[in-house]
């Protein structure tokens, strides 16, 4: 003790300050670790994939969700997207990603994408959506396609094991891994296409073990070490959400620009097909009638199998294939016909008109394969 006292008396001020800082840092770190041990979430008990599937599809979910989110999208190369899709020199957050806040309850969603140029607000109520971009003062209103598949699964699930049996023929799904995500007990599942030549490598999904809420979604392309798309929640809180949150007031006198989304076509019976038996090295697997309400029936062709397939939608009428939202995409020539095209690390889509028919060709395949199918039609 006397030696310690002597050292303290003879040590320089700088030495004493340095020792004091180290001791304080160790004390703070120890208390932080102890706090985590007391209040931190713990991984849930192991669960089989069938148990987790039944819990996810059969549960009702929380009353409401309030959370921060981080959204990153490296799919769409902004240099190839026309300038109309950017505002103030900064691409729209829906294209490149952003961070922000979200609220959700009973089919209603509000998201605030926060950027340096100004926030973008998105409110969805059922099939109606309203978006306001403060960076350039524009608003859009849309009616989204109605998709009732999830509701049918929730009310008519005969058995999670049977459902998984059908899915596993084309998708390899890992055993749920217990862990902690966004401060919540969670299960993480990895999914990858089975023997697919397509560009999708795998999808990683983490869900809340208690509520089934998706907490983290990562989508990877082939030969990609980082996710091409990521959506992550943080600071998640469950409970009632004030209904006023979902009321978005536009500036006085502003009228939103209407945007139309065509719903998915209804598929009919298999029909006789005069399409080429092979395109882009892929065999023709299916040819079915496809139609939308109020439109002449067309055809839906599928070349290849599962995730390694290219889908062709043929619609009667040789209207402008670059109208509406398609006008945002770069132009392309397909066998002398002008069209629109979008190429991403996860696949490509080509749309053009020829001979009184509008063709939409898409697939999670290399760009050259999708274009070869389009040119062979």
Which ranges hold each PLM region?
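Short, small/polar residue-rich loop motifs at catalytic or cofactor-binding pockets
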Residues: 117, 199-202, 345-346
